[in-house]
C-alpha cells in the first residue's frame, strides 16, 4: 500500500516554517517500532526492514515536504520570545482513509534555524522516555501524541555527559501549539493569528467553519479540551514537568515529554523537574498553570474575538475540570452515584496518604479489592496509623453500601480506572540503562507491559520502587 501525504501546513501557512531536510546520524539503526500503531496507520512492514531509512532521516517518502515550524512562548511564566522546532522536523502530513491527517514529526533530526544554542539532536535516553510515556498515556486512555519508532546511532551527543544520538518519530493529528499563536501576536501580526485560527477550525473543528460565532465556540472547546486533559493527568498522578505555553497542544493532547514523572508516594507538591526551583510546575499546581496558559492564548485572540466571549470561556475552565475530575475520582473510589459526602471522603483519604507517604497507584489499585461487607481491607497493612485508616475505612464502607451494587460490579469499574501499572521513572531508567549497553530486551518488554495497564501482574512492574528508584531527578536536557 502506498502512503499518501498532503502539504496543508506548507501550503496554507507559508510564514510559519522553514523548509529543510533532516541531517542523518552516523550508523543509524532502528531499535524499536510500534507495530500496533503502524498497522493502524497502514504503514507497510517493509519500511521497517531496510535500515534506518525514513526513521533516521536518511530518506523521505513520496509526498513528504519536510519543514521546521516557528513558534514562541512563555517559559516558567516569563516571555521567552522566538522558539520553534530546534531539533524536530515535520516530515509530512499523512492522509488517512477517513480523511483525517497524522503529522510525522522526526525529533533529533538536526540543526534548524530555530535551534538557538542547541545542536539539533536528541539522545537515546530522552527518546526512550518519550516513547514509553506517550504509549503509556495512550493505553491509560489519556489524549497524547504517539511514538512510532526509535533510531539509535554511533553519533555522540553531549549533554551532562556524552550520550548516543537518537531520533524519535512522533505522530499526532496536529502539532499546533499555544506558542504558534503567541509568536505572531507578539510580533503584532494579528492577521496571521487569525489565519492560524482559521487553519485550526478548517481542519480540526470543521463543524464550526461556517458558524458566525466560530471563534468563540472554537476557543471554548480548546478550554474544555485542556481542562479535561489536566483532570485526567491529576487522576492518574501524572506530572508533566514543563508546562510552558509552547508545550501546550491546541487539540488537548499531552505534548513534549521531558522531565515528567508519575507519583510514587502521594505528594501533592511533587516536583519532577529538577530545574523547577520554585515549583511552578508541581503536580498540584498543574490546573492553575493550564488556566494561566489559556489566558495567554486568549490574549492572542483578543484583536478579533470579543474579550467578554474569551473571558466567558475561561470562566468555564474550573467547572469543566472539576466535573471531569470529580467523575473520575468517584469511579476510582467505586462510587456509582454522587453523594454530598464524597468529596470529604476523598480529601480525608488524600490527607491520610500524604501523612503516610502512601503509594498513589498502589493505594487506589488495592482499594479496588475492597468488599463492602468485610471490615478487613488489603489496604490496611499499607498504613502505619491503623486507627486513622480504620476510621476512614468504616465510613468508606458505609458509603459503598448506599449504592446497592454488587462487589463484583463495583470492583470491575474500579479496576478499569485504577491502573496496576504506570510508567514510574525507575522502570524507564532501567530500560534506558540496558539500551545504552546495547540490550533492547527491557525496552520491548516494558512497552508490551504498558499496553495493559489495568491488568494485574505479579512482577516488579507493579511493586513499590526500590530505594534507588525514588526521587530520581530528571532534567530538561534531552
From Swiss-Prot:
Disulfide bonds join 272-476. It is an enzyme of class 2 (transferase). The active site is at 246 (proton acceptor). Changing residue 170 to A: Loss of AMPylation activity. Auto-AMPylated. Is probably auto-AMPylated on Ser-477 and/or Ser-478. ATP binds at residues 84, 86-87, 107, 119-120, 170, 177, 256. The keyword Manganese applies. Changing residue 256 to A: Loss of AMPylation activity. Loss of ATP binding. The keyword Transferase applies. Changing residue 130 to A: Loss of AMPylation activity. Changing residue 272 to A: Abolishes formation of the disulfide bond. Its cofactor is Mg(2+); Mn(2+). Auto-AMPylation inhibits the UMPylation of chaperones. AMPylation activity is activated in reducing conditions. Under non-reducing conditions, the formation of an intramolecular disulfide bond between Cys-272 and Cys-476 reduces the AMPylation activity. Shows a preference for UTP over ATP in the presence of Mn(2+). The UMPylation activity depends on Mn(2+). It holds the Pfam family SelO. It catalyses: L-seryl-[protein] + ATP = 3-O-(5'-adenylyl)-L-seryl-[protein] + diphosphate; L-threonyl-[protein] + ATP = 3-O-(5'-adenylyl)-L-threonyl-[protein] + diphosphate; L-tyrosyl-[protein] + ATP = O-(5'-adenylyl)-L-tyrosyl-[protein] + diphosphate; L-histidyl-[protein] + UTP = N(tele)-(5'-uridylyl)-L-histidyl-[protein] + diphosphate. Keywords: ATP-binding, Disulfide bond, Magnesium, Manganese, Metal-binding, Nucleotide-binding, Nucleotidyltransferase, Stress response, Transferase. GO terms for biological process: protein adenylylation. Mg(2+) binds at residues 247, 256. Nucleotidyltransferase involved in the post-translational modification of proteins. It can catalyze the addition of adenosine monophosphate (AMP) or uridine monophosphate (UMP) to a protein, resulting in modifications known as AMPylation and UMPylation. It could be involved in stress resistance and play a crucial role in regulating essential bacterial processes, including flagella synthesis and iron uptake. NCBIfam families: adnlytase_SelO, PRK00029.1. This is Protein nucleotidyltransferase SelO. It comes from Escherichia coli (strain K12). The gene is selO.
